[in-house]
């Protein structure tokens, strides 16, 4: 705060109007500087909350907009995760779609858009290759992203802080910028917006979040239905 006051001194005032304008500018910029300085601390809180949650269950709604093809889509279902390395998106709308990781293998079975096949690949742990929207952005983010404060906001009725994460090495990941909404009460991330390199925007809202609750092992298991062709995409 002292630095902000020093930077706003008027060495050679040009009349009362100039002084008033300068004071107003300083008053407006000081909170913004403070908020931006707090962004790493807010992110640290989100990381700590993420690691405290050994399991998590939530309802999710995904909004996808792709300007390249002029399309938009809304889908929903249940998101489950268990540390380390297990997660599942199980869609209710469209029913039957699933993306899950069992700790070693990532499965994508999307009969609504790719009927008759399931894609499997080996989990690599490399940035940009995880479909886990929490682990991808909360696993050691300070080393991979530049973080800044966007604005105070809310998710539903819950006050939250919106942060922007920009990859330190642009062009190495499939996204250009990520926005996360961190709950002020429990530091859980309740909304994620991914701005992909293609121009598509994917927003995922997490609701009814429950942490450290029992999750059956079957939630992270996938067996291809009879007659479904398995495509191995490991590399």
Q: Which residue stretches match the model-derived regions?
A:
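N-terminal secretory signal peptides that target proteins for export/translocation
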Residues: 1-13
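N-terminal leader/targeting segments and the immediate start of mature chains
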Residues: 2, 30-72, 82, 224-235
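Bacterial N-terminal signal peptides
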Residues: 17-28
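Gly/Pro-enriched, hydrophobic low-complexity segments
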Residues: 36, 123, 143-235
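N-terminal post-signal-peptidase region of extra-cytosolic proteins
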Residues: 43, 64, 73-75, 83-93, ...
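Short hydrophobic/aromatic-rich beta-strand segments that constitute the beta-sheet cores
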Residues: 60, 87-91, 106-109, 165, ...
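An acidic-aromatic
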Residues: 78-130, 202
């Amino acid at each position: 705060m002292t630095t902000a006051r020093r930077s706003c001194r008027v060495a050679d005032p040009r009349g009362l109007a100039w002084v008033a304008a300068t004071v107003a500018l300083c008053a407006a910029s000081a909170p913004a500087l403070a908020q931006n300085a707090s962004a790493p601390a807010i992110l640290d809180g989100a990381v700590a909350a993420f690691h405290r949650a050994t399991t998590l269950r939530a309802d999710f709604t995904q909004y996808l907009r792709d300007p390249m093809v002029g399309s938009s889509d809304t889908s929903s279902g249940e998101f489950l995760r268990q540390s380390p390395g297990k997660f599942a998106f199980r869609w209710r709308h469209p029913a039957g779609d699933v993306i899950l990781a069992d700790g070693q293998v990532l499965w994508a079975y999307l009969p609504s858009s790719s009927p008759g096949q399931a894609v499997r690949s080996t989990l690599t742990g490399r940035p940009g290759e995880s479909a886990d929207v929490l682990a991808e952005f909360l696993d050691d983010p300070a080393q991979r992203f530049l973080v800044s404060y966007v604005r105070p906001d809310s998710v539903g009725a819950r006050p939250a802080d919106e942060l922007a994460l920009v990859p330190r090495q642009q062009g190495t990941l499939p996204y250009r910028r990520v926005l996360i909404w961190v709950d002020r009460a429990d530091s859980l991330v309740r909304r994620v917006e991914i701005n992909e390199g293609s121009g598509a925007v994917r927003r995922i809202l997490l609701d009814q979040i429950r942490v450290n609750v029992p999750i059956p092992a079957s939630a992270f298991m996938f067996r291809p239905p009879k007659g479904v062709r398995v495509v191995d995409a490991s590399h």
